[in-house]
Structures are given as structure tokens and as C-alpha cells.
Regions:
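N-terminal substrate-binding region of glycoside hydrolase catalytic domains
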Residues: 1-86
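An active-site-proximal structural segment forming one wall of the substrate-binding cleft
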Residues: 34-45, 68-112, 136-150
Length: 193
């Protein structure tokens, strides 16, 4: 911490599969244990839970697919069909439980909307060329709406990459929609395209 003067928030990104390994099984310790280290040092934490990672077979728990959620195989990993009703139902239930635990917690600076696209950053530019599926604005809105439904006190943020790879962020329909819902923007850099 001493190497980063002014550091106020530590950001944790984890796959959904790590946090909910079974339908009725929650492993909150994977968030809480590292978070406590920073909270005890007077810092806050922020979370992004992802559905797709390219460093593991499935960011989405396998039980979601066994329940009937559709997916695509992409270079050795699975990408969920983000507008699949089963996927959305399981995500809705997960977010309800996550919000019950973290919404309004003063140690949580923000929650990053993360269940869409690679690394939860909203882009599918790496996967669409493989399987040919493109998700539109309505799918992105559904994901945003699920988060807004459950997180009413803690600030929600969204990656500017939801606008699309190399797309202008200013007045992008999905960014405008997110902002209209009280969601703020986040970027891995200094908000540059």
C-alpha cells in the first residue's frame, strides 16, 4: 500500500464459477478474505463478477449449463448465450444473493456490471468471429437492468467497452442507457478510447 500513495479502492475481479460453485452453494470467502486485508488498512473494495474468462474453461458455473443454459465453445472455453432465459434466471438469483450481502456495505466502493462479454467488460469482439453470434442492445440492457434491480444503494459502474470495440463512447446507446439508470463509467485506463 505504501507504494501507491492516495490509493483508496482495491478492485477484485473473479469468475462467477468461483463465487457460486453450486446452485445453493456460495463461496463468499473468495471475495471477503482478500477484501478484509484492504478494509483493515482503511481502504474500500470494488467487485466485478464475470461470466466469461479466456484463462479458464468457464467463468459461468458449470451447474448453470447443466440447468439448461445455452453456451458457445470458443477456443477451449465456454461463453454463455447471454440472452438465454435460463442464464438470465440464474444470474438474477445470484445477483439477488450478492446484493443481499454487499449492497449498501460502506466498505464496497462500487460494483462493476460484469456478466456480459470477455472478462465482464462488455465486448465480444474476440468471440463473435468464432461462433458468429452478436448480442444487441436489448441483451446488454437486460444485464444492466438485473444489476439495477438488486443493487440500489451501492454505486454501479460499467466498462466503456460495452459500447463496442473502438466505438465512440460519447452518446453510445448502451452508455446513454446505463447513465440514465444511474450507472457510472469505468475504464482500465483514464477513460480514453
Amino acid at each position: 500500500l505504501d507504494d501507491f500513495p492516495g490509493l483508496s479502492t482495491v478492485y477484485l475481479r473473479l469468475p462467477w464459477a468461483f463465487v457460486q460453485p453450486g446452485e445453493d452453494e456460495y463461496n463468499w470467502e473468495v471475495l471477503d478474505t482478500p477484501a478484509q486485508r484492504w478494509i483493515q488498512a482503511g481502504k474500500r473494495v470494488a467487485f466485478r463478477i464475470t461470466a466469461t474468462e479466456n484463462w479458464m474453461q468457464s467463468g459461468t458455473p458449470e451447474w448453470v449449463f447443466r440447468s439448461g443454459a445455452k453456451f458457445y465453445e470458443v477456443n477451449g472455453y465456454k461463453e454463455p448465450e447471454y440472452d438465454d432465459p435460463v442464464f438470465l434466471q440464474k444470474l438474477d438469483a445470484f445477483l439477488e444473493r450478492m446484493a443481499r450481502r454487499y449492497d449498501g456495505n460502506p466498505n464496497v466502493a462500487f460494483i462493476d456490471i460484469g456478466h456480459f462479454g470477455m472478462w465482464g467488460e462488455g465486448h465480444t469482439v474476440l468471440t463473435t468471429p468464432v461462433h458468429g453470434k452478436k448480442w444487441g442492445l436489448e441483451t446488454q440492457k437486460r444485464i444492466i437492468d438485473l444489476y439495477c434491480k438488486h443493487f440500489r444503494r451501492t454505486q454501479l459502474v460499467i466498462s466503456d467497452d460495452f459500447a463496442g470495440h473502438d466505438a465512440p463512447v460519447v452518446h453510445s446507446p448502451i452508455i446513454d442507457y446505463a447513465l440514465s439508470k444511474g450507472v457510472s463509467l469505468r475504464d482500465d485506463s483514464i477513460l480514453v478510447q
